Regions:
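Short beta-strand/loop motif that positions the catalytic acidic residue
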Residues: 162-164, 168
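Primarily recognizes the serine-hydrolase "nucleophile elbow" in alpha/beta-hydrolase
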Residues: 104-153
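Serine-hydrolase catalytic machinery in alpha/beta-hydrolase-like enzymes
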Residues: 2-107
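Alpha/beta-hydrolase-fold catalytic nucleophile elbow
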Residues: 55, 111, 135-138, 163, ...
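C-terminal catalytic histidine-bearing segment of alpha/beta-hydrolase fold enzymes
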Residues: 160, 177-218
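Short alpha-helix in the alpha/beta-hydrolase fold that links the catalytic acid
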Residues: 34-39, 172-182
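Alpha/beta-hydrolase fold active-site loops
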Residues: 19, 158-159
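Short, conserved loop/helix-junction motifs that constitute active-site signature segments
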Residues: 41-46, 151-157
Length: 218
């Protein structure tokens, strides 16, 4: 575990939160991207949750002609794996920080969209403490061949919600389906949702996420 805590936004749905959701944005966005989603979830009044929305570091991104932008990793194969491992360590540091603040790891959920979903899966499946769940939206599984050797027994029973757009032009739904099947092979519990949308989030998905979060945290 190394490095400073990532810059982030914190939103609390009530006093003295009893749970936390760490939600990772996609390529080129920042923590503000999912800030408007939090009130739309309309979580129960009795469920006080701290939402932590970190900003990815800025780095040179090959598909952006090397221009620096916020990204959890460069999709260049020669650099991507190292970036993903680095980002996973940074997210682990956020998880550990919530435990230091008094929350059980079983009250923590990792969530992510697109690139953020890759990091949520990369981190959560290998984390050495049991989590409340992993939420992976419009995303895929990085280097699934290594997962069988690296996954954490502590999180083998962690519920996973995956959701994807049928018309996603950025990360085709076939990649999400492939990730789901790889997780099934390792006996993970995956709930799968798909929607008539592109690379985005839709109202029905928000409602489904709300129900899933509530079921995991109450």
């Amino acid at each position: 575990m190394s490095g400073e805590i990532l810059e982030h936004i914190e939103l609390e749905t009530g006093d003295e939160p009893s749970a936390a959701v760490i939600w990772l944005h996609g390529l080129g966005a920042d923590g503000h991207d999912f800030e408007p989603i939090v009130p739309l979830l309309e979580l129960p009044d009795a469920l006080a949750v701290r939402f932590i929305l970190p900003h990815a570091p800025e780095r040179e991104v090959t598909i952006n002609n090397g221009v620096r932008m916020r990204a959890w990793y460069d999709m260049n194969p020669s650099q991507g794996h190292a970036d993903i491992k680095e980002s996973a360590l940074q997210i682990e540091a956020l998880l550990e920080r919530e435990i230091e603040r008094g929350l059980s790891s079983r009250r923590l959920i990792l969530a992510g969209f697109s690139q953020g979903g890759v990091i949520a899966l990369q981190t959560g499946l290998r984390y050495r403490r049991p989590l409340a769940g992993i939420l992976a939206l419009s995303t895929y599984l990085h280097d699934h061949a290594r997962l069988a050797d690296e996954y954490s027994f502590e999180n083998l029973d962690t519920p996973i919600m995956m959701a994807h757009g049928l018309m996603d032009p950025m990360i085709q739904i076939a990649r999400g389906v492939s990730a789901r099947e790889e997780l099934f092979k390792l006996n993970y519990k995956v709930e799968w949702f798909e929607y008539a949308m592109g690379h985005e989030v839709c109202p029905q998905e928000i409602a489904d996420i709300s129900r899933w979060l509530t079921s995991r945290l109450t």
